[in-house]
Amino acid sequence: MPWPKEHKRNTRERIVGAAAAAFRQQGFDQVSVADIMQRAGLTHGGFYAHFTSKDDLLIEALAHASTQVTSMLESPPADPASADRLLPAAMTYLSSFHLAHPEQGCPVAALGPELIRTGQKFRNELTAEIRSRLNQLYDLTSPELPPKIRRQQIAGALACMVGGLILARGLKESERRKFLEECHSFLRAALVDSNPKGATPKRRGTPPSKHTNSHRPRKSL
């Protein structure tokens, strides 16, 4: 008697979840199909009833990991009245927990350098994840700011977030917390202390496509 569809779907999800955690924790090349199935509590032979290869599995594992990061960054801000939620999200990303648990965190920080070395093999998946994160962070910026300033903020913030996490994981354990605190200070200065000096708020209700020069920040002489 064949297994019900729900059982097969649940088994597939177990494999994807186990792979997403293992790849981020140990690296794609360091994890075998047998390792993944053991982590999922399943037999090795059952893998090919769901996936054609480990490469095929990685694509779904990256999507699973991306969903986890999206949920992590959508945590409510400390100040619900604040229109700018980018800084709280960046602080959550650069947290001690995220630092210590790559298996539950950002796939770009955990796997990005490794996947880049594969050339075009997984480039589409990596690009999609970076774009997804940029879009999410853009929505967390203050709508009072001009679109150009918002784009600059998310580019700088994501670079600091991903780069900061990679560098912190490469440091001695005794140095990691201090380094994260310095990243926090930098982001706070860049995202909070520079406003409203660094940008002139746009009028409420003005769509980005109709944004005029009169509302843009003036260039310094």
Ranges and model annotations:
Residues G17, A83-H98, P113, A155, ...:
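Amphipathic alpha-helical segments that line or abut small-molecule/effector binding pockets
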Residues P76, L115, A168-K172:
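Secondary-structure edge/capping motif, primarily at the C-terminal ends of alpha-helices
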Residues R14, A22-D56:
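Helix-turn-helix
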Residues Q120-A128, L140-K202, K210, R218-K219:
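Hydrophobic/aromatic-rich alpha-helical bundle segments in the mid-to-C-terminal region
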Residues F51, L58-A65, M72:
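Alpha-helical DNA-contacting segments of helix-turn-helix folds
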Residues E60, E74-G105:
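Hydrophobic alpha-helical connector segments
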Residues F51, A110-R117, A159:
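Short helix-capping/turn signature of helix-turn-helix
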